[in-house]
Amino acid sequence: MEIQFLGTGAGSPSKSRNVSSLALKLLDERNEVWLFDAGEGTQHQILQTAIRPRKIAKVFITHLHGDHIFGLPGFLASRSNQGGTDPLTIYGPSGIEDFVKTSLKVSQSHLSYPLKFVLLQHPGVAFEDQTFKVTFDRLDHRITSFGFRIEEKPHPGELLIDKVRAAKIPSGPVYAALKAGETVTLPDGRIFDGHDFIGPAQPGRTVAIFGDTRMCNRALPLAAGADVLVHESTFGPDESQLAKQYYHATNVQAAALAKRAGVGRLLLNHISARYLSPGVAMLEKTARQIFPNTHVVKDFEEINIPFRSEQSEPAVTVKS
């Protein structure tokens, strides 16, 4: 599981940061990539990465401001032009379906794959299967803006092979049955419960990805205990009144939430073009005074999210 940031800027693109988009890469877990937001130029950013558009199976839209959606129709059309045939599902607020369908209709773009929309209204579960669960709630922005909580379900424990051998259970298909937790009967009449030969389940990982928001109580349960929290940082530490006025957050407000929620690592994005390198360093430094495991991300940066049993300090490794 990895997050790759495709756009980390706020409002408008700059020379160093494109507008909002990130990819949650689940290639080992599902052979898929999930896209969160698709600001203008997202497909250009994807070209600079190893991400294959046909691998993108889901797109989650936090809200309908242009810097989060203007790149979506172009990406969808290019995915089709590049031979994509696998279905794609878009999750987002009411209005996203009209926006996409109107854009495709006016431009006479025809997709080569099925496109499904899941319109998110009442807080709850956006998606769930045997391996992942995605929940959402409304945050506090000028328009409807969502935060998403992506939870990987626990992985079954490993077969305790030494214990199996100590019981003198012959190798073969019976091992698979034991690992599946089944009760097996051997030719010699001995009966074994597979659960007795399975180690503890491995906890899954949790990532919280927020759209634009100012501080609100609904953010806490979405972020609680997450391995990684991705949170906007449009304003600096001394601009809380501006943040409130414009429905955004400061870096130190995000850090306070991360501390309160007990997350593993805080990743700050949605960085204003007003902050050049010295300013970005200041955002990171002042946030770390509240929550030490904070990092201000940049475009194309990749964040690996290991299982908790594999983690050492820091909890998440950063590659650029």
Curated annotation (Swiss-Prot):
Stored InterPro entries: Metallo-B-lactamas (IPR001279), RibonucZ/Hydroxyglut_hydro (IPR036866), RNase_Z/BN (IPR013471)
Keywords: Endonuclease, Hydrolase, Metal-binding, Nuclease, tRNA processing, Zinc
Cofactor section: Zn(2+)
Positions bound to Zn(2+) 1: 63, 65, 141, 212
Enzyme class per UniProt: hydrolase
Cofactor info, note text: Binds 2 Zn(2+) ions.
Pfam families per the UniProt record, alphabetical: Lactamase_B
GO molecular function: 3'-tRNA processing endoribonuclease activity; zinc ion binding
Residues that coordinate or bind Zn(2+) 2: 67-68, 212, 270
Catalytic activity, reaction form: Endonucleolytic cleavage of RNA, removing extra 3' nucleotides from tRNA precursor, generating 3' termini of tRNAs. A 3'-hydroxy group is left at the tRNA terminus and a 5'-phosphoryl group is left at the trailer molecule
EC numbers: 3.1.26.11
Active site (UniProt): 67 (proton acceptor)
SUPFAM superfamilies the record matches: Metallo-hydrolase/oxidoreductase
Keyword tRNA processing carried by entry: yes
Quaternary structure (record): Homodimer.
Family recorded in the similarity comment: Belongs to the RNase Z family.
NCBIfam families: PRK00055.1-3 (NF000801), RNase_Z (TIGR02651)
Function: Zinc phosphodiesterase, which displays some tRNA 3'-processing endonuclease activity. Probably involved in tRNA maturation, by removing a 3'-trailer from precursor tRNA.
Protein name per Swiss-Prot or TrEMBL: Ribonuclease Z
Natural source organism: Lacticaseibacillus paracasei (strain ATCC 334 / BCRC 17002 / CCUG 31169 / CIP 107868 / KCTC 3260 / NRRL B-441)
